[in-house]
Amino acid sequence: MTNIRKSXPLMKIINSSFIDLPAPSNISSWWNFGSLLGICLALQILTGLFLAMHYTSDTATAFNSVTHICRDVNYGWVLRYLHANGASMFFICLYLHVGRGIYYGSYMYTETWNVGVILLFAVMATAFMGYVLPWGQMSFWGATVITNLLSAIPYIGTNLVKWIWGGFSVDKATLTRFFAFHFLLPFVISAMVMVHLLFLHETGSNNPTGIPSNMDMIPFHPYYTIKDILGLLLMITVLLMLVLFSPDMLGDPDNYMPANPLNTPPHIKPEWYFLFAYAILRSIPNKLGGVLALVLSILILIIIPLLHTSKQRSMTFRPLSQCLFWLLVADLFTLTWIGGQPVEHPYVIIGQLASILYFSIIXILMPXISFAENHLLKW
């Protein structure tokens, strides 16, 4: 008799995706983050669903409804902090996942990579709208500043901003629509994840050497299911330590003050995971230029496959490219730090230099060094 997992139509899909999937025998822990991201997404949807049962998307009651969740709902505080810190874990895994893709040349699977970049944009949009929902000071002013950037778009900008606001400022209509989109987008993201996996399973996984591993494959289960469970346990441990010991460590104290349009906070800044892009935005004195740089800081990922000049796919055997990659990582940490600092000397000039370096490494230095390494191979 045929095994049910190989005959039932639904089980066949699950079997070919998670059980009998041929996987390279040498993929390292850097390949764990895909499954961790899937778990993060499931966690966010679940906690978000339960939070939405108690939340009200009205300017008069939003802040109080979040307070009510924390004080009066059974384990509401756990739900709220799991959701808030779950977003941080989501972005940590996302950035490590993208970093792995750049280091090991996974971007050569262009369809998978491009869907991944669109996913990154979708997750960033969802997180931004979620930050507005508690209707604290930083929620209100963050929404005002970031949506106002769209007014830099020539000709249609001002009308576009009013259309997004649903009025002449961030108000009741804005909060309601942000809640609607924040609820909807994770399900769109889930569908896009399926497309991401569909494209990935067309080619199979890359591996640390960057050499095709068709000769040496092993089944996904039990080898990588066990490995993924270990990664999951480590991530859940870090998340629970955050939630139970210092739930507000990554948040902004200003968000514990109800939104007040008459009182601007001294330093308006987004959540930590957007600080690098915020620093790039602020480092350009021109509004439209800043907005373009902000969008390009993520959109530049799309052209990375076109900039690949090396004869080798992975950076495993390319020490010069490795140096550049880690310089890029250090640069992103610098930008994240600058994004959280006030706009004054010396932070402005450091931010500008770090922004120039960011675009230079990706667009100029990496292709050139890869080209040079090709010639070094002949020595």
From Swiss-Prot:
InterPro entries reported for this sequence: Cyt_b/b6_C, Cyt_b/b6_C_sf, Cyt_b/b6_N, Cytb/b6-like_sf, Cytochrome_b, Cytochrome_b_C_euk/bac, Cytochrome_b_N_euk/bac, Di-haem_cyt_TM
Binding site for heme b b566: H97, H196
Chain sites annotated for binding heme b b562: H83, H182
Matching Pfam families: Cytochrom_B_C, Cytochrome_B
Cofactor: heme b
PROSITE patterns named in the record: CYTB_CTER, CYTB_NTER
Binding sites annotated in the UniProt record for a ubiquinone: H201
GO BP terms: mitochondrial electron transport, ubiquinol to cytochrome c
Transmembrane segments: 33-53, 77-98, 113-133, 178-198, 226-246, 288-308, 320-340, 347-367
Cofactor detail note: Binds 2 heme b groups non-covalently.
Any one Gene Ontology molecular-function term assigned to this protein's record: metal ion binding
Alphabetical keyword list: Electron transport, Heme, Iron, Membrane, Metal-binding, Mitochondrion, Mitochondrion inner membrane, Respiratory chain, Transmembrane, Transmembrane helix, Transport, Ubiquinone
GO cellular component: mitochondrial inner membrane; respiratory chain complex III
Topological relation to the membrane, as annotated: Multi-pass membrane protein
Function: Component of the ubiquinol-cytochrome c reductase complex (complex III or cytochrome b-c1 complex) that is part of the mitochondrial respiratory chain. The b-c1 complex mediates electron transfer from ubiquinol to cytochrome c. Contributes to the generation of a proton gradient across the mitochondrial membrane that is then used for ATP synthesis.
Family note: Belongs to the cytochrome b family.
Subunit structure: The cytochrome bc1 complex contains 11 subunits: 3 respiratory subunits (MT-CYB, CYC1 and UQCRFS1), 2 core proteins (UQCRC1 and UQCRC2) and 6 low-molecular weight proteins (UQCRH/QCR6, UQCRB/QCR7, UQCRQ/QCR8, UQCR10/QCR9, UQCR11/QCR10 and a cleavage product of UQCRFS1). This cytochrome bc1 complex then forms a dimer.
Miscellaneous comment text of the record: Heme 1 (or BL or b562) is low-potential and absorbs at about 562 nm, and heme 2 (or BH or b566) is high-potential and absorbs at about 566 nm.
Protein name: Cytochrome b
Source species: Myotis oxygnathus
Biological classification of the source: Eukaryota, Metazoa, Chordata, Craniata, Vertebrata
